A protein has these predicted regions:
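Short acidic/His/Gly/Ser-rich catalytic and metal-binding motifs that mark active-site loops
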Residues: 18, 54-59, 128-130, 197-201
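Short amphipathic alpha-helices and their capping/turn segments at secondary-structure boundaries
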Residues: 33-41, 109-110, 177-189
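Hydrophobic "anchor" residues on beta-strands that sit immediately upstream
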Residues: 44, 118-119, 189, 235
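Metal-dependent catalytic neighborhoods of phosphoester/phosphodiester hydrolases
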Residues: 107-115, 246-249
Length: 256
């Protein structure tokens, strides 16, 4: 995905541009999306589902495709193809956990409608995302998730041994991060959009253009920072193009 950097990192004196204006003097940058597959003795968990292959037509009523084109993505880079490369079928996923229900995280949630996977988001996220008027609200697009049988969590929750969902509102009303405690690699915290990039994390923390509640956002960043300091965790940010290139990514790489 690509977008104006201002969406990710607010700077004074700038305005947000669309892809038709990407050659004007703005920071038009790569905005990677990612999913995380966690394998435990008690089941496989998929964290987020990224963007759909029909992004341009699905997003057309919203105009999101002009601000966040999911271009330069090969067919074999979409979620189902990446899982196939890893030898994992959709019906082998036991839990699909959505950090929040924005279009670039819930875009492939419907892939799992005819499987036995438990579909999970936070209670506050579900309450907002299913009940606003109309088909979309900002980056929430009901076509991605309406009608799915959602189970919800409230508060910080250990969903599997060594896997904790952390409430981190601010970006959305019910945004979550995920903490995974690994025997060899140690603790990893997948912030999702609670923290977009290393530059967002600071300190000091620097907010983004898409923040539902700024006070909650700052509090969530500091909450995550406290957990990192306690656990010496590796932070994996939501959309950090520089960091994603340094991580061990599937299908070749993994963390244990």
């Amino acid at each position: 995905m690509h977008a104006d950097l201002t969406f990710l990192l607010l700077k004074p004196g700038v305005s947000i541009k669309t892809r038709s204006e990407k050659d004007s003097p703005i920071d038009w940058v790569e905005v990677p999306t990612h999913c995380v597959l966690v394998e435990t003795d008690e089941g496989k968990l998929l964290w987020d589902t990224s963007c759909p292959s029909d992004w341009e037509t699905r997003w057309a009523p919203t105009g999101l495709q002009e601000f966040f084109p999911y271009d330069q993505v090969a067919d074999d880079e979409y979620l189902d193809k990446q899982l196939n490369k890893m030898g994992v079928g959709l019906d082998e996923i036991d839990y699909v956990v959505l950090s929040h229900l924005h279009f670039d995280h819930a875009g492939n949630a419907r892939m799992f409608e005819n499987t036995n996977a438990k579909m999970i988001c936070s209670d506050r996220e579900k309450e907002f995302a299913l009940n606003f008027e109309g088909d979309f609200n900002g980056a929430h697009l009901k076509a991605d998730y309406l009608g799915i049988n959602w189970e919800t969590v409230s508060g910080d929750t250990e969903i599997l041994p060594g896997v904790k969902l952390i409430q981190a509102p601010g970006h959305t009303t019910g945004c979550m991060s995920m903490q995974v405690d690994l025997p060899d690699s140690g603790t990893m915290i997948f912030t999702s959009d609670a923290v977009y990039m290393g530059d967002s994390y600071g300190p000091p923390a620097a907010p983004a253009a898409i923040v539902n509640n700024l006070e909650q956002w700052f509090a969530s960043v500091e909450k995550l920072r406290g957990i990192q300091e306690q656990t010496n965790a590796t932070m994996v940010f939501g959309h950090d193009a520089g960091q994603i290139r340094e991580l061990r990514t599937a299908p070749e790489g993994s963390y244990t």
